[in-house]
Each structure stands twice: as structure tokens, then as C-alpha cells.
């Protein structure tokens, strides 16, 4: 194990000098330094550049407070390695695989795997076309998720990305008994804490491993924490043969951390100040999130859209890797429609008759057609009023408004805030409900009866309670 000494510390960047006759550590190797020689105060550095003359530039995974020039640095001879396997379920980790919940730490001999790996080879990949039922009507009907696919949750600040992720974790664990890995990348510590306790109370935590590198962490940790979560998920897929759900909240923060690291390493910035290696870094992460013949990793990634600008390089680069997109729209939150999923902007390559079936496909496309026509008529309604519409158009507008409200529903994870019990709606029930609305079966019921309910029977029940 080669040993070097700290040459300089500039924020999270640490330069380490090795003797020129020593073997230099490889790129991505983990180096360890002990503050004041105290073995309990370990700081891990990751090699990023080799500068020549035995000097390497590293990025710290923790705060560099207390590091001084001349401190000894040890090369571990391998990349950062994190615990994997069933023991990770119900636990919370940081980027290094250290437990940060209040439970006992992992045994020294626990199985570990490096966070840097190659993507599965082409002949190991599987091409599954099975739908993953989420119980959320707007998703299951209009932008269904593929098992083993990649899903992007797009939206600006405060439109409900994290709540939607929490509901998906809840539904998958309760209804499918599936294993989930939640990776918090550069988001609020408070939200992570709330999520942990909510999942503990509901019992979902026993099926979930959680990895956090939050806003207060150095950029190196925020950049690598997604790989830590992915490594845990890959083990369940490749060794245990499981179908795993990988949640990443937020993939934009991964890009943002990469941009900070790139600037710290002195690279010339590219478009809008992002790192020149943006597409490469995104590709290295996304290509490992895939389904193999042994199991699958279905990833659901929250993607913050800066200033609601979808042409920004960060969300635009992520777009290229996705099978389904769920777009959250601020206009819908202002109308009180939750989840605020835009039914016309959201899309999925799974929405085809071969995958979802002819009836589902026909109902979904007709719903989109009605909503699109309603959007076109809104300008006329705003200027001239409803009276200028033909009877046929008035009927269409009435149905479109009922559909728009029926696409909303209460969430289980939001019950403590809304006081309303959440609902899980099977796909068959969802398709039947929208088909009957399109057929005009519920034209007489008030629009408010369709707001924030589960199945179509709940609409009828709500209308009765309203005295209709």
C-alpha cells in the first residue's frame, strides 16, 4: 500500500504527493487520511487527476476541516466500496457505505462492492416489456412505467416530485412487496429525515435501503452517492435475481455536483457553465441502470428543471436515456389538481397496443384527444364564453373537465397533511372509469365529485353525499 503526504488543501480538493519511485494510485482509487493520526477520524479522498512528478489531485468525500500539509495519506488500492446484500435493507448509508442511522454499524467483514463498475455487456441485457402497475391513475393510463425501464419525473421547485416518489415507494412495497433503493442526491436533509420516519412508521423501511448525500455534503459526495445507491441495487439484481426499484432524488443535483467538481479540477466549462463531461458522466450512470437476464432495475428519477426551462443541458441530457417521462406542471397545482402530472406532456414508449392492450390504448388516446381539444377551446371560452360553443363542444368541455379532475387522487403518504385517506387504483379499474366518462355515463354528475377520488365508484359515492 503506497503512502503519500498532503501537499495542499483547497476546499474539497486535496493534492497528495507520493515518492516518485512509488506506484501511483489509479484514477478513482480511494485514499484514506487520518486527522491528527486518530484512526476514528478518517477522511476518504478519491483520485481524480494525476498531475505528474508523483502528485495526484483528489476530491474529498467529507469535509476537509482539520487537514494539514504533511499528513500521511494511504492508498487503499481499490475504489470506494460499500456494503451490499439483505443486511442493507432497513438501513441508511452515506456515500462511503457508513451507516448514518442510529443502529449498530456494519461488521468489518460484511460483503462490499466497488461503486465504479462497467455497465452490463450487450448480451447480458434483457428486453422485457412488462408494465409496472403504480396504482396512480394518471401514470398508469397515460404514461405507464415499464418494468426495468427508466422514468423521469420532471418539474420545477415545489410541484410535488418528492411526494410522488414517496407514494411510488409506498405502493410498490405495499402492493408488490418489491425491494427499493432510495438515493437522496443533494436534496434537503429535512425531507430525507421525514421520509425515513414515515417509511419506518408504515413498515416500508424493511424493504428499502436508503443512501443519502444531501445539500450540506461536499460536491464529491453528492457526485458519487448515486453510484453508491446503484451498486446496492445492482447486487440485488445480479446476485439475488430480484426486480429492484431505484429512486434517485434528484438527478439534477448529480449533474450540479459534477459541475462543481469539474470547476474545482480546473476544467473549462461548457454550455451554460456545465462540465464538458456532462453527457459522459450521465451515460456512465444511466447505462448501469438496466435489466439483465438475472433481474431488473427500474429507476424513477426526479429531475429538477431550472427555471422551468426544459432546454437546459442538465434535464435535456437526462431526456435521452428515459423510457417514460412524467411532467409535473405548476399550472395544475394552482388548480388544486394533485398529482400535478401534465397528461399531454407526459409520455411513455410503453403506451402501445402491443404492450398495454388495445382497449387501454384506445381509451388513453381518446382521453388525450379530448384534453387537447379542450385546451384549444380554452382561448375561445376565455374571450367569448361558453355560449359561443356548439352543443357538441359544450359536451366535450364538460367531459374534459371531469377527466381532468378524475386524473387527480389522494396519496397515502399525504394523508397526514390532507386528512383524506389515499387510494390505490388497479389499471383495469382506471381504464374502465375513464372509458365510462368518455361514453357520457356520468355527464349528469357535478364536476367537483370527480376531484381527488380513487375509482369511479368513489365519484358516484361522493356525488350522493353532495346530495346529487
Swiss-Prot record:
TM stretches of this protein: none
Cellular component GO terms, alphabetical: plasma membrane; proton-transporting ATP synthase complex
First-tier enzyme category under EC: translocase
Highest taxon listed in the record's lineage: Bacteria
GO molecular function ontology, one term from the record: ATP binding
Keyword Ion transport carried by entry: yes
InterPro entries tied to this protein: AAA+_ATPase, ATP-synt_VA_C, ATP_synth_F1_bsu, ATPase_a/bsu_AS, ATPase_alpha/beta_chains, ATPase_F1/V1/A1_a/bsu_N, ATPase_F1/V1/A1_a/bsu_N_sf, ATPase_F1/V1/A1_a/bsu_nucl-bd
Annotated membrane topology: Peripheral membrane protein
Quaternary structure and partners: F-type ATPases have 2 components, CF(1) - the catalytic core - and CF(0) - the membrane proton channel. CF(1) has five subunits: alpha(3), beta(3), gamma(1), delta(1), epsilon(1). CF(0) has three main subunits: a(1), b(2) and c(9-12). The alpha and beta chains form an alternating ring which encloses part of the gamma chain. CF(1) is attached to CF(0) by a central stalk formed by the gamma and epsilon chains, while a peripheral stalk is formed by the delta and b chains.
Cited function: Produces ATP from ADP in the presence of a proton gradient across the membrane. The catalytic sites are hosted primarily by the beta subunits.
Family assignment from sequence similarity: Belongs to the ATPase alpha/beta chains family.
Protein's name in the database: ATP synthase subunit beta
Organism annotation: Streptococcus mutans serotype c (strain ATCC 700610 / UA159)
Gene behind the chain: atpD
Amino acid at each position: 500500500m503506497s503512502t503519500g503526504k498532503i501537499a495542499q488543501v483547497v476546499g474539497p480538493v486535496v493534492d497528495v504527493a507520493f515518492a516518485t519511485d512509488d506506484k501511483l494510485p489509479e484514477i478513482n482509487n480511494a485514499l484514506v487520511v487520518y486527522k491528527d493520526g486518530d484512526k476514528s477520524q478518517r477522511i476518504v479522498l478519491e483520485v481524480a487527476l494525476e498531475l505528474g512528478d508523483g502528485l495526484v489531485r483528489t476530491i474529498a468525500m467529507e469535509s476537509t476541516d482539520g487537514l494539514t500539509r504533511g499528513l500521511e495519506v494511504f492508498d487503499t488500492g481499490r475504489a470506494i466500496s460499500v456494503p451490499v446484500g439483505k443486511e442493507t435493507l432497513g438501513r441508511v448509508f452515506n456515500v462511503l457505505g457508513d451507516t448514518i442511522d442510529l443502529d449498530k454499524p456494519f461488521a468489518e467483514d460484511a460483503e462490499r462492492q466497488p461503486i465504479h463498475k462497467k455497465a452490463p455487456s450487450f448480451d447480458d441485457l434483457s428486453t422485457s416489456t412488462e408494465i409496472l402497475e403504480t396504482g396512480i391513475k394518471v401514470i398508469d393510463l397515460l404514461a405507464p412505467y415499464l418494468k426495468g425501464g427508466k422514468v423521469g419525473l420532471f418539474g420545477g421547485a415545489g410541484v410535488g416530485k418528492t411526494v410522488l416518489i414517496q407514494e411510488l415507494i409506498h405502493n410498490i412495497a405495499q402492493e408488490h412487496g418489491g425491494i427499493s433503493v432510495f438515493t437522496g442526491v443533494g436534496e434537503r436533509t429535512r425531507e430525507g429525515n421525514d421520509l425515513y420516519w414515515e417509511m419506518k412508521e408504515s413498515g416500508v423501511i424493511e424493504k428499502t435501503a436508503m443512501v443519502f448525500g444531501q445539500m450540506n455534503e461536499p460536491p464529491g459526495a453528492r457526485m458519487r452517492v448515486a453510484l453508491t445507491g446503484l451498486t446496492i441495487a445492482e447486487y440485488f439484481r445480479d446476485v439475488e435475481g430480484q426486480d429492484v426499484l431505484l429512486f434517485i432524488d434528484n438527478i439534477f443535483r448529480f449533474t450540479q455536483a459534477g459541475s462543481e467538481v469539474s470547476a474545482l479540477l480546473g476544467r473549462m466549462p461548457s454550455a451554460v457553465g456545465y462540465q464538458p463531461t456532462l453527457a459522459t458522466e450521465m451515460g456512465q450512470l444511466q447505462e448501469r441502470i438496466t435489466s439483465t437476464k438475472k433481474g431488473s432495475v427500474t429507476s424513477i428519477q426526479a429531475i429538477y428543471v431550472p427555471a422551468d426551462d426544459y432546454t437546459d443541458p442538465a434535464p435535456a441530457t437526462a431526456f435521452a436515456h428515459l423510457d417514460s417521462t412524467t411532467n409535473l406542471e405548476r399550472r395544475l397545482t394552482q388548480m388544486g389538481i394533485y398529482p400535478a402530472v401534465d397528461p399531454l406532456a407526459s409520455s411513455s414508449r410503453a403506451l402501445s397496443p402491443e404492450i398495454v392492450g388495445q382497449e387501454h390504448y384506445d381509451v388513453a388516446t381518446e382521453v388525450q384527444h379530448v384534453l387537447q381539444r379542450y385546451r384549444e377551446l380554452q382561448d375561445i371560452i376565455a374571450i367569448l364564453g361558453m355560449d359561443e360553443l356548439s352543443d357538441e363542444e359544450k359536451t366535450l368541455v364538460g367531459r374534459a373537465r371531469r377527466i381532468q379532475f378524475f386524473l387527480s387522487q389522494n396519496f397515502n403518504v399525504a394523508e397526514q397533511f390532507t386528512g383524506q385517506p389515499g387510494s390505490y387504483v388497479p389499471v383495469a379499474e382506471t381504464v374502465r372509469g375513464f372509458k365510462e366518462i368518455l361514453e357520457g355515463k356520468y355527464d349528469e354528475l357535478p364536476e367537483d365529485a370527480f376531484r381527488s377520488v380513487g375509482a369511479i365508484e368513489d365519484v358516484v359515492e361522493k356525488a350522493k353525499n353532495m346530495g346529487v
